[in-house]
């Protein structure tokens, strides 16, 4: 395989950054559907009984087969705030992986990181679509989240691929915890957001397992604690801004 010039990696990283922060996200998978969907008789029917073709018409936009949930104003604001936090978290995750991939020492590690980042793009698109449905927006601080996480990714990868992959394991473990919390805090009737977060959680667990299997090492406790504090700052700010 022909090796790429370092400048090529830098240009690609800049392109990924601009797309992640400023361009509309495009998903390679449909927006996850709720487990049950009401039919005209208002009788729940199993997921998968809806029109398959309609699911695949536009893989980057909201899936119209999802239930039309009527939320109160307070519930809508709560769901929107939580989905904005999740979107900001996906921006940060993309930046972390992009920064790590930029200085990864092996092609295998770089490929694993970019593959995970690609799935995070699906998460971005899903969260964006849901925020639009809720009449809300993404965090105004997304450029800040991206820059900070990208720098952390570069620093993590500079210590070696095994430590870099350990950051992925720890990041995904913490993200899983955040998603568990948000699933409990979502309004009970918001099945659309819940379906999205359920699939995101499944993907994040897979990313962490893949990084661990690839040789990711356990991070020192102080580093894990620092990551938790940084995440708390981001989630608190993104909830409101």
Give the residues covered by each predicted segment.
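Non-heme di-metal
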Residues: 1-241
């Amino acid at each position: 395989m022909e090796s790429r010039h370092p400048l090529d990696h830098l240009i690609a990283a800049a392109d990924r950054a601009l797309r992640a922060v400023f361009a509309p996200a495009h998903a390679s998978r449909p927006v996850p559907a709720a487990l049950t969907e009401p039919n005209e008789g208002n009788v729940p029917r199993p997921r998968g009984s809806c029109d398959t073709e309609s699911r695949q018409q536009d893989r980057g936009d909201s899936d119209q087969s999802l239930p039309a949930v009527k939320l109160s104003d307070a519930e809508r604001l709560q769901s929107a705030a939580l989905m904005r936090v999740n979107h900001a978290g996906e921006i940060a995750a993309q930046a972390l992986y992009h920064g790590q991939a930029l200085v990864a020492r092996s092609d295998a590690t770089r490929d694993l990181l970019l593959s995970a980042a690609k799935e995070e793009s699906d998460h971005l698109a899903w969260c964006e679509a849901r925020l639009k449905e809720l009449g809300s927006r993404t965090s105004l601080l997304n450029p800040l989240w991206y820059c900070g996480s990208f720098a952390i990714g570069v620093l993590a990868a500079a210590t070696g691929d095994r430590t870099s992959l350990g950051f992925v394991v720890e990041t995904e473990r913490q993200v899983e915890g955040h998603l568990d919390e948000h699933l409990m805090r979502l309004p009970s009737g918001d099945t659309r957001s819940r379906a999205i977060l359920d699939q995101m959680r499944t993907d994040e667990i897979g990313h962490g397992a893949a990084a661990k299997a690839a040789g990711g090492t356990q991070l020192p406790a102080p580093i894990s604690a620092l990551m938790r504090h940084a995440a708390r700052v981001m989630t608190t700010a993104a909830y409101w801004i």
